Amino acid sequence: MNDGVLPQNNEDASVEATLHPVGISFSKSSIAAFAEEGISEIGIYVYMDGSLIYGEKQPLVHGAIEVPLPLGENLQTFVVANADEVADADQLSTAVIRQNDNMQKPVYISEIIGFTSDNSVKSLDVELKRLVGQAVFAPVESQEEMDGIIQFDALDITFTNVGVAYSVKEEKAVLEDVTVRTNRESDFGAYVYSFPTENNGSRTSVDVAYLKEGVIVNRTNGSLDTGIIFKSSKRSVVHMEILNEDWVETEWESMIEEIDF
């Protein structure tokens, strides 16, 4: 993969002179979102005839960045923030954004922008929008009920059909199941971000495994069909009675053993 250095021709010293600095500035809403999420750098990817000529992460300085580009060319670019990886970026047609954090943080991306790098283009105004949607698992029990739970001390929440990677060109997600472990400290709640799944024709369900001291002691008696389709900047909340015995394979009462002591 090109690390952001333009191709050089050692036999032609004039190549460097043909580079044209193009500024990239961001909207106030984008800068505000970056500050809120603690984002301090962004990735810029520029393509000529579909092939990468510049791909680099840059620190944000006053919300503007300057990129050296070849003069007089028709180019395409996209900008991404808070992504763990942009894989297969050598070609625009194969560039895929991936997350490696169990989908626990949002990703921001611009549209693919076409422009000509002539002297009249001093700067590109870029707006990054939150690409991901979010699903939240929220138990409905009261705090008093939470405090009285002795049957388990953690939950593994599995969200099915989560968009864990995203094709920039095709605007389509790669789907996998994602499991998030939660416990009493977070009131047994959990969440996951997902790239949009509208173009995948799939819906998300939830499976819950109940654990005590790291061992599964119960689980839901089937996937809970939530009907969730992930959409950019949309949050869906799944409310569940985690103590309701109608939802689990084994009644909690039957798991309690009384012995003399």
PLM region spans:
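Bacterial Sec-dependent N-terminal signal peptides
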Residues: 1-26, 30, 137, 233, ...
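Conserved "repeat-terminator" motif of extracellular CCP/Sushi domains
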Residues: 125-132, 192-197
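Tryptophan-paired
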Residues: 31-91, 146-232, 254-261
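Ser/Thr- and Asn-enriched, surface-exposed coil loops between beta-strands
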Residues: 18, 61-63, 118-120
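Surface-exposed interaction/gating patches
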Residues: 127-148
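Structured interaction patches on ligand/partner-binding surfaces of diverse proteins
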Residues: 84-123, 214-245
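Beta-strand secondary-structure signal
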Residues: 16, 21-23, 43, 78, ...
